[in-house]
Regions:
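C-terminal substrate-binding/active-site "lid" region of AdoMet-derived donor-dependent transferases
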Residues: 162-220
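Conserved SAM/SAH-binding beta-strand->alpha-helix loop
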Residues: 108-110
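Conserved class I S-adenosyl-L-methionine
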Residues: 73-85
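S-adenosyl-L-methionine
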Residues: 5-73, 114-146
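A short SAM/SAH-binding and catalytic strip from SAM-dependent methyltransferases
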Residues: 149-163
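Conserved SAM-binding motif I beta-strand of class I
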Residues: 101-106
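Conserved SAM-binding loop of SAM-dependent methyltransferases across substrates and taxa
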Residues: 85-98
Length: 221
C-alpha cells in the first residue's frame, strides 16, 4: 500500500525581467572582447548554475524577511561586498526590492568597470544611485563603517576575512551573508561548515533566517 499526500503552498515568485538591462550586455561583452579578454571566464562563472541558484535563494529569503519583519515605506540603501561583475545579484535586487542606493565593493577594478556597463539600465534609466568602490575589504572597514545602509550583502564570505568589525553607520542594518565549505580552493580562506559557525564568524546577534543548500563542486583534477 502506498499513500501519497500532496499539500499545496503558495510561493511568491521573483521578478526575473532582466530584458531591459540585457540590452546593455552587448556593450559589456564587447568591452570584454576588445579590452579584457581574460574576463570571459569571469562572465561565464558569474552565470553558472551554482551562482545563479545561490543569488536567487538569497534574494528570495531577503525579500520575504523584509516583507514580514522589516516594513519600510522608503527605499533601501544596500551595500554589496565582493560584488564582482554585479550579475546576477544587482538585477535580482533591483527588480525585486525597492532600492534607493547601491554600494558595490570589490578589489577587482576591472570587474567594477564591467559592472557599470552590465548594470547600466538601473543606473541610467531606473535612476538608482550606484556607487562602485575599488577596496580591499578587510582593510577598508573604517570607510565602510561610515556608510549608512539598511542591508549588507555578501555571497562570497569564504573569500574574505571575518566581518565582525563591519558595523556600518546603521546599527539596525540587516546582514545577508552566504558562505561555503569549499576549502579546497585557495580563495576559500574563511570557509565554514554550519550556519552556527557562519553566524559567529560574521558576529551576528539576531537572525531572521538560516538555511543550507547542497550544491555540487566539480573537481577537474
Amino acid at each position: 500500500m502506498f499513500v501519497y499526500l500532496i499539500q499545496w503552498e503558495e510561493k511568491k515568485m521573483l521578478n526575473f525581467n532582466f530584458l531591459n538591462n540585457m540590452r546593455h550586455w552587448g556593450d559589456g561583452l564587447a568591452k570584454v572582447e576588445h579590452e579584457m579578454k581574460h574576463k570571459h571566464d569571469d562572465f561565464r562563472q558569474a552565470l553558472n548554475p551554482n551562482t545563479m541558484e545561490a543569488a536567487i535563494w538569497l534574494v528570495e529569503e531577503l525579500k520575504k524577511t523584509l516583507e514580514e519583519n522589516y516594513m519600510k515605506e522608503e527605499q533601501y540603501n544596500i551595500l554589496v561586498l565582493n560584488s564582482w561583475l554585479g550579475i546576477p545579484l544587482v538585477p535580482l535586487l533591483c527588480e525585486n526590492i525597492s532600492v534607493g542606493e547601491l554600494h558595490l565593493v570589490d578589489i577587482d577594478n576591472e570587474a567594477l568597470e564591467l559592472s557599470k556597463v552590465f548594470n547600466k539600465h538601473y543606473i541610467a534609466e531606473e535612476y538608482i544611485k550606484v556607487n562602485h568602490w575599488n577596496l580591499d575589504i578587510p582593510f577598508a572597514f573604517d570607510e565602510l563603517n561610515q556608510l549608512k545602509v539598511d542591508i549588507v550583502i555578501t555571497m562570497g564570505a569564504e573569500q574574505m576575512y571575518p566581518l565582525k568589525d563591519l558595523k556600518t553607520a546603521n546599527k539596525h542594518a540587516i546582514f545577508a551573508v552566504q558562505n561555503s565549505n569549499v576549502i579546497e580552493e585557495m580563495y576559500g580562506i574563511n570557509c565554514v561548515d554550519s550556519e552556527k559557525a557562519l553566524i559567529e564568524n560574521a558576529g551576528l546577534k539576531n537572525t531572521y533566517y538560516t538555511g543550507k543548500q547542497k550544491q555540487f563542486y566539480y573537481d577537474w583534477n
